[in-house]
Amino acid sequence: MTDAEMEKIWNNLKRNLKSYCDENGFSDVMLGLSGGLDSAIVSVLACDALGAEHVHALMMKTDYTSELSLQIAAKIAALNGFDYKVVDIQPVIDNQKRFLAGVFGEEAKNIVLENLQARERGKTLMACSNQFGYLVLACGNKSESAMGYCTLYGDTCGGISPIGNLYKSRIFELARWRNTLNEALPEAVIERAPSAELSAGQKDEDSLPPYHVLDTILAAYLDDGQTEAQIVKSGFAEKTVRWVIRQYHRMAFKREQTPKALSLS
């Protein structure tokens, strides 16, 4: 994308987020700030749209939260001047783990424990929404949503999804462009490998194709209407293309339950 195109998208997102908040009676918004790029860009967008005094963020750490994530999240809050707090949700996860072992009659599987973390974060944000009257912003992107790489009732919680119509590759571009205006995002949050940090050493690309591959396939299939055969013919591995398309259709049940994504126009 050109600088002009990115500026247009950013301004449209700002306008649409402000309009959505006004129309629904919200002056303030809240999000989970993870130290990753998606929540980082959403926090900056919210500050640009509403003013930093109307943005509130929680870093909800667990045993898998890296020191780098804590440092990055704190730096983003400092650069942009919004309300920020760190809370430790590991004790809640540990209690849930013990409770579920009793329910199951055996130890919970890793996938259960991973999703517990995301759901505890979502539950905490929604509790804050009830307590303080904030609109919760979901921080998922179009790539994750298409692949179902998200936790229902966890990171999908929220009243609106500001970047839900942006592929991950576009978010990297948009972040770099936004930093040309002023330093709103630490370079480390743009450079680091994406990770949900729900287990030790976890990386997005352990579960998904590289984003530049995934997003090109998704754009060809969803936006350009190309067939599987046409996408393969353009140079992608048949196995990868088939997996992406099948996963997209398999994960429709998740997309049906995610918040509305802001329009880019």
For each of these PLM feature ranges, what is it?
Residues 1-34, 41-265:
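ATP/NTP-dependent adenylation/nucleotidyl-transfer catalytic domains that generate, transfer
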